[in-house]
């Protein structure tokens, strides 16, 4: 009974397998074209990443400047209080 379950198929089908070589293997001009496309894609991708990083850095600098402005205002307020106290004690 088990010999019928584990039996090999009578023939092997090759219809689902593609037997083709890459065009870049046979034609060197196509290899250069694909590398040019790849380098163009890589340069566009790098430009997008650089732009994102630049925008992120600008946003961080804007936040830091705003924080610095608030700290300076607070420091000015504290200095004015200290000056008033010093004048009142004299």
From Swiss-Prot:
Main location (coarse class): mitochondrion
Pfam families linked to this entry: IATP
Entry coiled-coil feature ranges: 42-89
GO molecular function, one term: ATPase inhibitor activity
Compartment list: Mitochondrion
InterPro entries on file: ATPase_inhibitor_mt
An annotated GO BP: regulation of mitochondrial ATP synthesis coupled proton transport
Keywords: Coiled coil, Mitochondrion, Transit peptide
Highest taxon listed in the record's lineage: Eukaryota
Keyword Cytoplasm annotated: no
GO cellular component: mitochondrion; nucleus
Biological function: Forms a one-to-one complex with ATPase to inhibit the enzyme activity completely.
Family: Belongs to the ATPase inhibitor family.
Name this protein carries in UniProt: Putative ATPase inhibitor, mitochondrial
Native source species: Schizosaccharomyces pombe (strain 972 / ATCC 24843) (Fission yeast)
Gene: inh1
């Amino acid at each position: 009974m088990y010999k019928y379950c584990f039996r090999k198929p009578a023939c092997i089908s090759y219809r689902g397998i593609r037997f083709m070589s890459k065009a870049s293997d046979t034609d060197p001009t196509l290899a250069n074209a694909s590398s040019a496309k790849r380098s163009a894609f890589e340069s566009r991708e790098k430009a997008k990443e650089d732009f994102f990083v630049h925008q992120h850095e600008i946003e961080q600098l804007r936040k830091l400047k705003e924080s610095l402005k608030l700290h300076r205002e607070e420091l000015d307020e504290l200095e004015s209080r200290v000056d008033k106290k010093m004048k009142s004690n004299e």
